[in-house]
């Protein structure tokens, strides 16, 4: 079977329909973006559904010439086919993708992303997709969130230590850097940048013959798994960024029983994340002065981890890059919503969920462990909403606690006295491990299963 006919980089996007119609049955891979309904909200008008979809990143695609010779090789481009931008644009075609095989499925307002997919040769392959939110015209949705809020539901229960389910904002161009040699642009996932200044084969849609990094402001709304999470702004100048950022991680801030399976934010179940970008005058025209994180679960507001709220109001590491004011300007001009799932072969994601950052051991996040024990690891994002602060969720105060309990505790719960009967851990909750002193009896229908010396879980 011949490879599919695809979009030439120099062919207008409007020609896509004609190219698809000319393809032979069973031989083509057209670019069909999975629909993902999102919502734009106002206090006066409520939330209105948006006609949006997702598109897979440009670098995940096959590029080839008319004879199906690859235009890319390990470490860059085929210099015979791509000696310069104009020749590359003339010679090379870019494929559409099979989204389901790439670990991406959508249903209504819900997006599921898998780390691994079954391989045709047996076993599993790491697909680790990265996606961008696209409008009905084939350009990126530009979220202008200064003085606004962003809310979404997320299910991280299937993400173990070492996995990172991410939802963040990147200051990419609306058209993905489309130009005369790359008319595919955003419609094919072009133009990625972030605060790590990645060096890619294409830089904002242009062949990167000078091997420059591509820096831009990055606002990490969520980097997390079922054990830890972080909220982190990364401000940039044109050529450099605050790559480390100044984030808030509940565990890293000392609130070690706030976030996790069975904890205050119970990651064994779906929950809602609300992120508010507060300005000095309370409107989108003001200067960004703080970023606030809130949670809901089962429609009920969850108390913040920190007294006074989980808020980032200063960013010393970003002072050389303009601090929060720079991020506010990026949020005002518009940023692209990015979704990803990934793991880390070198550092095992320890910066996110191990040591001072989380409860995971230094080796739990090894991708070989993840694949062996959690080949179906995935994240689900749903009900993505943005708009006026206070417009994207229905807030309900938490019920009053029983007389014998407190509203919030910074230490893991245990039985109240040494003579009390054993407490019962919930499904997915921790039930054993070195240093663990909490509930060791699992709820009915589950048993305490060993994962490693530091962690056993009710399954």
Swiss-Prot record:
Assigned GO CC terms: extracellular region
Q: Which InterPro entries match?
A: CBD_sf, Cellulose-bd_dom_fun, ConA-like_dom_sf, Glyco_hydro_7, Glyco_hydro_7_sf
- Which sites does the entry annotate for glycosylation? 78, 204, 394
List of residues that carry Pyrrolidone carboxylic acid: 23
Q: Where is the active site?
A: 218 (nucleophile), 223 (proton donor/acceptor)
Sequence segments annotated as region (Catalytic): 23-397
Q: Where is the signal peptide?
A: 1-22
Q: Which domain of life is it from?
A: Eukaryota
The GO biological-process annotations, alphabetized, read as: cellulose catabolic process
Extract the Gene3D superfamilies matched here.
Glycoside hydrolase, family 7, domain
This chain belongs to the protein called Endoglucanase EG-1
The species is Hypocrea jecorina (Trichoderma reesei)
Q: Which gene encodes it?
A: egl1
